[in-house]
Amino acid sequence: MNIIEQLEREEVARLAKTIPDFEPGDTVIVNVRVKEGERTRVQAYEGVCIARNGGGLNESFTVRKISYGEGVERVFPVHSPMIDSIKVVRRGKVRRAKLYYLRDRRGKSARIVERSDRSDKAKAQKAAAATAAE
């Protein structure tokens, strides 16, 4: 094992941040700490994850949303202290790792179909029902 990889793993373990599993195509809400003068507040940024880049401590993801008819993209480092929390709202069904083609799309053609796989809650209920039946 590389020394740098080992140091990165230790740092990620030290940060102990719970980051949900999300992929490009998923709609996420990123709560970002914003400092205005002396005050610090949390601002929600909701959009579609169009890319994930890097790995380890340097991993980042790009979120795209439409604000007042204008497309806005923002790149967030996954392990940034400015990120308060990340929540996955819905899972998207896509065939690409980078969804940059959404930049040129408008309206219905920019929609992403929701993935039909069962949610964690549904999986847990099914497992509980299976154990109760036995």
UniProtKB/Swiss-Prot annotation:
InterPro entries: Ribosomal_bL19, Ribosomal_bL19_CS, Ribosomal_bL19_sf, Translation_prot_SH3-like_sf. One of its GO terms (molecular function) is structural constituent of ribosome. GO terms for biological process: translation. Residues 108-134 are annotated as: Disordered. One of its GO terms (cellular component) is cytosolic large ribosomal subunit. The keyword Lipid metabolism does not apply. Keywords: Ribonucleoprotein, Ribosomal protein. Residues 111-123 have a biased composition (Basic and acidic residues). Residues 125-134 have a biased composition (Low complexity). Belongs to the bacterial ribosomal protein bL19 family. This protein is located at the 30S-50S ribosomal subunit interface and may play a role in the structure and function of the aminoacyl-tRNA binding site. This is Large ribosomal subunit protein bL19. The gene is rplS.
